[in-house]
């Protein structure tokens, strides 16, 4: 019985690896050129990756997901127009 369960798990893992390899998506993604006030971040939690004009203080807890992309650089805040601006430019 243990042998069958182990074989099933290995087969499932093999199928998942093959599917991931055939998606054409590079992982992890290569760093991209970011807009002014942004910086490329790797494997950051989405809830703590950047501050916003609406929420200028860091949250108490961060998620453990792993995201890649352009996020507001230190001392910049994401505004309603999705731009990273200095604090004095926040409404």
UniProtKB/Swiss-Prot annotation:
Belongs to the serine protease inhibitor-like (TIL domain-containing) family. Tight-binding competitive inhibitor of chymotrypsin-like proteases; inhibits host chymase, cathepsin G (CTSG) and chymotrypsin. Inhibits chymase-mediated generation of vasoconstrictor peptides: angiotensin II and endothelin I. Reduces chymase-mediated vascular permeability and vascular endothelial-cadherin degradation. Keywords: Disulfide bond, Protease inhibitor, Secreted, Serine protease inhibitor, Signal. This is Ixochymostatin. It is found in: Secreted. Disulfide bonds join 34-70, 43-66, 48-62, 53-90, 72-84. It comes from the Eukaryota. Residues 34-90 form the TIL domain. It holds the Pfam family TIL. GO terms for molecular function: peptidase inhibitor activity. PANTHER family: GEO11767P1-RELATED, RIDDLE. It comes from Ixodes scapularis (Black-legged tick). Residues 1-20 form the signal peptide.
